[in-house]
Amino acid sequence: VSEAIIRNIAIHYEVIGHEGPWIALTPGSRRPYNELLNLSKEIASVGYRVLLHDRRNCGSSEVGFDASASEHEVWADDLHELALQLNALPLVVGGSSAGARLAILFAIRHPKATQGMLLWRLTGGLDAVNHLAQEYYGQFIALAQNAGMDAICQSEHFRSLIEARPSNLNKLKSTPVEEFIRTMTYWRECFLESSTLPIVGASEEQLHAISSPACLIAGNDVIHTPVTARKAAKLLTNCEIHENVVTHYPDDQLLKEWDRQEWKQAEPKLAKIFTAFLKNHSIQ
């Protein structure tokens, strides 16, 4: 477990494996990377190096609010800089949900640095966008407007970041509330713009322009719908899609929330599918 200063932010990271091509995997939401340790070890065991990191404002990394781009673009550029420092380019990029968004934006913004994509539980659709825009941004904008940065520090998510890295408390308290609200508002606007896009964060043209091979495992809940996965798979020029990794439900009977236990139990399947895909594309 190590740290690097990436664009003035301390980023907590870990490399699993000692040799072979580099793969970066990222979890969903703003969760820490620990949940991907077992999957990463399975993939690394057949000759890969897996880079895991806590994104800014996640896990044990430092908080930092950059309104120069959407949150997912900021994360994608942070990962590129981290991989550059570790001499880990080109990368196979992957992840679930928000981590899959990061991977796709990495491929869009850094095509020469991208060797392939391993994606699962892609997010898309109006319901998902509205629900997540409130969860990721709206609730924090309202808190900051009503009760300032003290209330942000006491919120469940940011409290967990302070527990993981106590210096985040001072950094949050010294962030001007106007700057925090401005950044969160801009990130929310970027997110809401995705309501008509095939997936959150990328247009049809952007997806179609990605030339790296992609392996995509469809979700089975209302936020990560099979329809979203199918749309993305059609638009990506070189993509294989798997719809039978977790329980398959009709499109009008999807789970209301993703089943963490089911995905945890499916990890050996994911590892098998992903490593077979990499070998098929001579990434070995």
Q: Residues of each region from the PLM?
A:
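Active-site loop/oxyanion-hole signature of alpha/beta-hydrolase fold enzymes
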Residues: L52-L91, E257-P268
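Flexible "cap/lid" loop of the alpha/beta hydrolase fold
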Residues: I104, I108-R109, T114-Q145
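Gly/Ala-rich beta-loop-alpha elbow adjacent to hydrolase catalytic centers
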Residues: G95-G99, A103
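Conserved alpha/beta-hydrolase "acid-adjacent" motif
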Residues: V222-T228
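Catalytic active-site module of serine/aspartate enzymes centered on a nucleophile-bearing elbow/loop
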Residues: C239-Q284
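Conserved HGGG/HGGXW glycine-rich cap/lid loop of the alpha/beta-hydrolase fold
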Residues: N8-E62
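Hydrophobic, aromatic-rich cap/lid helix
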Residues: K171-S203
